[in-house]
Amino acid sequence: MGAGENFCYTFGVLDALDVSGGRIVAHGWVVSLGEHPITELRLAIGDAPEGSVHREFLPSPDVAKVWPQLPGTGHCRFSLQVEVGEEQRRRIASREVISITPWAGDMPGVPLERIFPLSLGAAQAQESCQVGGGDFVEISFSFLALFRLLAGLRRDESVLDAGCGIGRMAFALGHYLDAQARYEGFDISDRFVTSARERFRPLPNFHFRHADIFNRMYNPKGAIRAADFRFPYEDRSFGFAFATSVFTHMLRGDVRNYLREIRRVLRPGGRCIATFFSLDAEARSGIEAGRSTLAFRHKLPDGCLVTSRRAPEAAIAYPEPDLRQMIAEAGLALEVVHPGSWPGRERFLTYQDVFLLVRE
């Protein structure tokens, strides 16, 4: 598995971005995960490139301390101040995406993106910890960048968020999607859905539903089996769907049903980004060598591997051939797999393995 034909693997964080006094000010860090180092950062506002804006990086011992396994983290910080004119400020005010793209040699990497200003309230750290932790805003916009990069997500699309939680992925979408778009999210936690509804109250085209689905970890009193759940949407309703950190907590029958349902509600040509813990040779090697953040050592009768027999839904992995078979049986085409960092890989897109699926 490797990067896409049009980009290379890079990894970084946009710590802060502000637009004031006629300039864009941005701070963050980024490293190359490939053979070539990052040589420059290029700025774009919407579809309009603004050119190269940065070529020198600053010492970053703080990054190296947190990410010692990544190459180049000792000298990867950037601090930008870019003058913007009236037309550029107009595009920013109309919620055009501000992208800072690292370039390694002649290949672009994964963009660092924001929309300014933010108009929705972000979750506080205590609430965000309940859905995986991390910086709520940064994680949301990092996935918006992937949705745009991998699936070409447009601003006017109909979007399904299977497993929406408190609306972490929806947060960036709430700034990106326009009034003609439609967002639908569902989650098995009534408390999470209530929180999301409150946060997105200003957006009438964003809808959140509670699905009372049984899960031993997250909804032990649920009335519906995930393997029997029918998504509450009409056939061919969406152009884009995603399920992040959903299949990583699901047993085989549940995975099969959700894949079939995703196919049912997607229009022909519709795309889906789904994340998994996929066991290929490199992942198995990482587990055996102790490099992996998760040790999938317990095999269940349905063929999946888990980290805990007592709480199997805490983290679930599947052999990659099994995932490919389930995807094909659901009537979806697997376009590409981008590896995750979880088993200690040196080249990755994000933490979990990212699958791009298409309904043909």
Q: Model-flagged regions — what are they?
A:
Residues 1-118:
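Basic, ligand-binding patches in group-transfer machinery
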Residues 113-150, 166-173, 180-230, 271-360:
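Class I (Rossmann-like) S-adenosyl-L-methionine-dependent methyltransferase catalytic domain
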Residues 158, 270-271:
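Short glycine-centered segments of the SAM/dcSAM-binding site in methyltransferase folds
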Residues 242:
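A conserved beta-strand element that flanks and buttresses the S-adenosyl-L-methionine
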Residues 256-268:
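A short glycine-rich, Lys/Arg-flanked "PGG" loop and its adjoining helix->strand segment in the class I
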